[in-house]
């Protein structure tokens, strides 16, 4: 006989509903910057590159990224070992962003850790936790944070998001690709623009 409980405890329903954070989905390219064994790395699409490999691979990394990394190296070196900064590299998509509103090239949307197999773990989307990958406990000036569109106290349906999207577009007075809905560090995307063209949101198996 083995004396052990294998079924996990069920979490209690909270008396007070958690806040649902709705952030703007930027039209950018996914980029992760992390440090492993004191060496900075970048991860884009299906490639992971050490900082000392970048010069020989300038032709395969995002446009403008190599020089940006060189210009901001001192600030990026404050990333802790095994910590990951996840975000959007903007400027290559169909939607164009005004420098007055978006004065950065890289906008953080998550923090994480990386294991020895170069897999992400402990991914967190709460903006209050975004300082922790950095030794200074400050987000470097070269890194922005994705805009928060709404903080609401209910899980929005598609119809709710349609209304929120229309209001947000009117508020910012520009095209918006969509939203990311974050509830308890579980995210789902609501997409309204594809290749720069407005469309209705629909479910699709990725």
Residue ranges and their predicted role:
Residues 1-206:
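Core nucleotide-handling region used for phosphoryl-transfer chemistry
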